[in-house]
Amino acid sequence: MKKALILTGNFVQDHEFIYPFYRLLEEEFEVSVGINENTKVKGILGTDIPPNKNHPILNIEEIDVNDFNLLILPGGVKSMEKVRQNKTIIKLISEFNKQEKTIGCICSGVQLLISAKVVKNRKI
């Protein structure tokens, strides 16, 4: 089964999380969620993240990049200001890049790529 990881934090831009979350499920991905705060949070517009109340949240410290095929980094300026300060998340992004796995960014999610220093000599 294909596995995707969405990394985010409090005040993510709601639709930038919700749309890829449900589209990946529709495409039969197993979708895991890693949240900077390691707990359910709210999107900037008030949506519960993750939206399904029983959807598990992975502990950031325990995520193994080898378990995933795809990484999604949704935006939300307020969220990314905090998430990009989490050294573990930045290391995870660097490892996804090192293993040449697909990384999808939406809007200000690209800030995480900059913090992980994986944008040099690339078109974003």
Question: Over which residues does each language-model region extend?
Answer:
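Anionic-ligand binding patches
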Residues: 124
